[in-house]
Amino acid sequence: AENNLKLPKLAEKDKCFQSQFNQETCMTRITTGLQEFQIHLKYLEANYEGNKNNAHSVYISTKHLLQKLRPMNQVEVTTPNPTTDSSLQALFKSQDKWLKHVTIHLILRSLEDFLQFSLRAIRIM
């Protein structure tokens, strides 16, 4: 199975790493990334077979974090493209049970990495 989810991640060009840190660019990327994750977290919430409260909590907590960071942004962050959302939803609907488990794992792993790098960047600020 190929990972074509296009999950958000921080890269050198986002200027969130200590070597080329730029607060404005970094905050914009963190906020945009969290916003992009909302689509994937909706999928997680709908398809997670474990404790539904945990899946909902991850979605809500990430949404609250996004709402806290948005006012700190000097640049207006654009919302993800609706066609991206609908094409991802179509991809998700066509998955079998095993692929759903793998997708959930990839989403959570990517979110964890993204949040760790974001926290490091925020500490630099």
Curated annotation (Swiss-Prot):
GO terms for molecular function: cytokine activity; growth factor activity; interleukin-6 receptor binding. Disulfide bonds join C16-C26. This is Interleukin-6. The keyword Secreted applies. Signal peptide: none annotated. Component of a hexamer of two molecules each of IL6, IL6R and IL6ST; first binds to IL6R to associate with the signaling subunit IL6ST. Interacts with IL6R (via the N-terminal ectodomain); this interaction may be affected by IL6R-binding with SORL1, hence decreasing IL6 cis signaling. Interacts with SORL1 (via the N-terminal ectodomain); this interaction leads to IL6 internalization and lysosomal degradation. May form a trimeric complex with the soluble SORL1 ectodomain and soluble IL6R receptor; this interaction might stabilize circulating IL6, hence promoting IL6 trans signaling. InterPro entries: 4_helix_cytokine-like_core, IL-6-like, IL-6/GCSF/MGF, IL6/GCSF/MGF_CS. It comes from Neovison vison. It holds the Pfam family IL6. Cytokine with a wide variety of biological functions in immunity, tissue regeneration, and metabolism. Binds to IL6R, then the complex associates to the signaling subunit IL6ST/gp130 to trigger the intracellular IL6-signaling pathway. The interaction with the membrane-bound IL6R and IL6ST stimulates 'classic signaling', whereas the binding of IL6 and soluble IL6R to IL6ST stimulates 'trans-signaling'. Alternatively, 'cluster signaling' occurs when membrane-bound IL6:IL6R complexes on transmitter cells activate IL6ST receptors on neighboring receiver cells.
